[in-house]
Curated annotation (Swiss-Prot):
Record-annotated Protein kinase domain positions: 82-381
Alphabetical list of SUPFAM superfamilies matching this protein: Protein kinase-like (PK-like) (SSF56112)
InterPro entries: Kinase-like_dom_sf, Prot_kinase_dom, Ser/Thr_kinase_AS
Gene3D superfamilies reported for this sequence: Transferase(Phosphotransferase) domain 1 (1.10.510.10)
E.C. no: 2.7.11.1
Protein's organism: Ictalurid herpesvirus 1 (strain Auburn)
Catalytic activity of the protein: L-seryl-[protein] + ATP = O-phospho-L-seryl-[protein] + ADP + H(+); L-threonyl-[protein] + ATP = O-phospho-L-threonyl-[protein] + ADP + H(+)
Residues at which ATP binds: 122
Segments passing through the bilayer: none
Protein name (Swiss-Prot/TrEMBL): Protein kinase ORF16
Protein family membership: Belongs to the protein kinase superfamily. Ser/Thr protein kinase family.
Keywords: ATP-binding, Kinase, Nucleotide-binding, Serine/threonine-protein kinase, Transferase
Single GO MF annotation: protein serine/threonine kinase activity
Length: 387
């Protein structure tokens, strides 16, 4: 293995004994003493370890906050590291130190290439996805991600590779991570159990920016395909909201040449997330009406707008839509009061925002608010309340 970055040209001996007594692995104000991370010292240079120890983050108040901000279920083992390294090559790890992982296919860690200092490497078997019609040879996921990044609507995609193998292909990406995983994580609970009260004015401005970005992408024939709060993040305190996970990105007609077979374009079905799909969504039939497609995006934005202020996934994604009742506003206000999700605000601003949510979440597409009107109404709220 050769390296010109953080990785050692020749790995050292993994010394689990004494790892804890030696202070473990230092990440900013945090010392990780689990011996399962001893391999990091063996594979990464002193320069990399010193960089990791000197990391800072505006949300780190103590060592306990470091791991609280980093997603993942468990620490990355040497076995998992070597397995992914053999798949994607050292280039991915020369500027990325993985610490946590999910199902051995998504690694979360730290990178000097990221504006937040944090990054995520995703390496999965390729069972879905096509090439961008507007950029031959470039996966639609990459094309959409980079176009979104250019307009400030996505974190930076640092590296990607399509790995061809015997009978199966894999796709790997390395990208900036948000300050605290997804938007839900960012506005969710702290270790103390307390919610992070949100500034409603800031929420309105961030949603306005998101709607504008989605409109620009759709004007470029790019549809995200899986809009939900889990696929949004923030890379700066307070916002803006940025899109992540472009796996289902597609052009309007959803016709793309597959990445896994050497054949012509096919029409893809867009599964998305069932609980977040609009009522009119048909998993078996691609949408052929641009207005209907846009109204589906409006529905998904309504769910995002709702969940951002109530912080209650079960309520928002209830398949029976129990929240969609005549006393909708009273129900939402009660949940918000119980969750303590909003900082003190002008009740008239909340009233106007809830009105927009209600308009976005009308089941009848004939009366559901369209994207242009939503953009206009959000602009009026920003102007009226001097946000």
């Amino acid at each position: 293995m050769t390296s010109s970055g953080f990785l050692r040209a020749h790995p050292g001996v993994v010394r689990r004994c004494g790892f804890t007594r030696g202070g473990g692995l230092k990440v900013g104000p945090c010392a990780l003493t689990d011996p399962g991370l001893a391999w990091v010292h063996a594979y990464y240079t002193d320069e990399a370890l010193n960089w990791l120890a000197g990391l800072d983050n505006p949300l780190w108040k103590s060592g306990a906050d470091v791991m609280d901000l980093l997603p993942g279920d468990m620490y990355v083992s040497e076995h998992v590291f070597k397995k992914i390294l053999s798949r994607v090559g050292p280039e991915f790890f020369d500027s990325f130190i993985p610490i946590r992982e999910v199902e051995e296919c998504i690694l979360f860690g730290f990178s000097p290439l990221s504006s937040t200092g944090m990054a995520a490497l995703k390496a999965i078997d390729l069972v879905y996805g096509g090439y961008a019609p507007a950029a031959p040879g470039i996966p639609m996921e990459v094309y959409a991600w980079e176009m979104a990044y250019k307009i400030g609507a996505a974190p930076r995609l640092l590296r990607w590779v399509l790995i061809e193998g015997e009978g199966i292909e894999q796709f790997a990406t390395l990208a900036e991570s948000g300050l605290r995983g997804s938007l839900r994580d960012y506005i969710g609970t702290h270790p103390s159990g307390c919610k992070t009260p949100m500034d409603l004015g800031l929420v309105v401005k961030n949603v306005h920016g998101l709607v504008a970005a989605l409109g620009m992408l759709m004007d470029s024939n790019i549809y995200h395909g899986d809009l939900k709060i889990d696929n949004l993040t923030v890379t700066e305190p307070g916002g803006p909201y940025k899109l992540i996970d472009f796996e289902f990105a597609h052009p309007f007609e959803a016709r793309m040449r597959p990445m896994i077979e050497a054949r012509g374009p096919i029409t893809w079905l867009m599964p998305g997330t069932p609980a977040c799909n609009p009522p009119e969504h048909d998993e078996e039939t691609p949408c052929r009406d641009r207005r209907m497609k846009e109204l589906g995006v409006t529905w998904q934005l309504g769910l995002i707008m709702l969940e951002t202020i109530v912080l209650d996934e079960a309520l928002v994604r209830d398949e029976n839509m129990e929240w969609k009742r005549p006393d909708f506003k009273r129900l939402v206000s009660a949940v918000m009061e119980e969750n303590g999700s909003l900082a003190p605000h002008d009740p008239r601003l909340l009233e106007g925002y809830l009105d927009l949510i209600g308009e976005c979440l009308k089941r009848d597409t004939a009366v559901r608010m369209d994207l242009v009107t939503l953009m206009t109404e959000l602009s009026l709220l920003i102007e009226k309340f001097k946000l």
